[in-house]
Amino acid sequence: MKNRIFLVVFSLVLVCNLWSCHTDPLLQPVPKNTDISFVQPANWPTPNYNFQNNTLTPDGFALGRRLFYDTRLSIDNTISCASCHEQTTAFAQIDHPTSHGVRNQLGNRNSPALFNLAWHTSFFWDGGVNHIENQPIAPIMNPVEMDETLPNVIAKLNADPTYRQQFKNAFGTEEINTQRLQKAIVQFMGAIVSNQSKYDQVKNGKASFTADEQAGYVLFQQKCNTCHAEPLFTDFSFRNNGMPITLDSGRAHITGLASDRFKFKVPSLRNLNFTKPYMHNGSIASIGAVLDHYTSGIVQSPTLDPSLQNQITLSATDKSKLIAFLNTLNDYEFVKDVRFKQP
C-alpha cells in the first residue's frame, strides 16, 4: 500500500515537473504589484485615447504584451511587432534603416518609435490609420511586413489553449476575434508612456538644466517648436521637411492631394538617442547630420514647409547646445521598464 501511494505521489510530481518544463514562457504574468494604470502626466494635454471603451486591466495588458512579441502574427511565424519595435530602441528599430519583414523583405520607411501613442490622432508616416485600435492590423496584413490574414491569425491563436485561457481572463470568454485582438494589443501599446526624461524632471522641479542644455532649450523654442511642440515634441502634423524627392509621395498616398506630396508625419524628438537612424526613410544616421540637413541640405519643392523656405540658421556652437538639450529628452528608465519587456 505504501509503495502504491509513493508511486501515485511520484507520478503527480513528475507530471507537474514536466508541465512546468513545457510551460510557454510567454505566459509569464506581469510581475505582481506592477502598476499598469494609465495616468496623464502633469501638464500634458488630454490624450486622444483614454481606454474608455477598452478598460486597461492586468490580464488585458499581459495578453497584449504576449501578442506584441508573438511571431505567429506573421505568415511564416518569423516576424512579430517587436521585430521592428524593440524596447531598447524606444520601440523603434536600430539594425535596419527601414522596416524588416517576412522573407527578408525591406520596406521603404523607417519603423517609427512606439511611445505616447494614446496622444496620437493618426498613425504611420503617412497617417494612413486614424484610430489606434486599427493600427496593429495594418502591419499584419502588409505584404512586405507580416503578410498574414486575420482569419489565419485567429486560427493560430485558437489552436493554442493557453491563448484561449488568456482571452477568457481578459474578456470573459474564450472567444478570439479581431476586435479582441486589437483591443488587447492596444492595452499594451497604449500604456507605453515615456515621461521620465531629464526634461520631464526639470519641468517637475526635480532637476535643473546645465548652462548648455538651457541655452539649447532657448534655441529649440526659437527654431524648432513650431513643428515639435512641447511636451510631446510633435504637433502630429504632416510636413515636407525638404528631404530629397523620391517615389514615396507620403501623405498624398492617402489623401490623393497634390498639395500633400512628400509630406510626412512630424515625429517626436523624445528618445532620439535610441531611435536612430532618422527621417521617414531612415537615411540620416546622426542628430548632427539632421541639423546639417536643416541648415544646408533643404531640397526645394512646391510643397516644402514655409518655415523651411530659407533653411534654419545655426552655428556650430548653436548645434552643440541644441544637441545638449535634445539629449535631455532621452528617457533611460523607459527603455528598461520591466512592464514592457519581452515575457
Positions of predicted regions on the chain:
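Periplasmic c-type cytochrome electron-transfer domains
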Residues: F6, C21-P343
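Bacterial N-terminal signal peptides that target proteins for export
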Residues: M1-V8
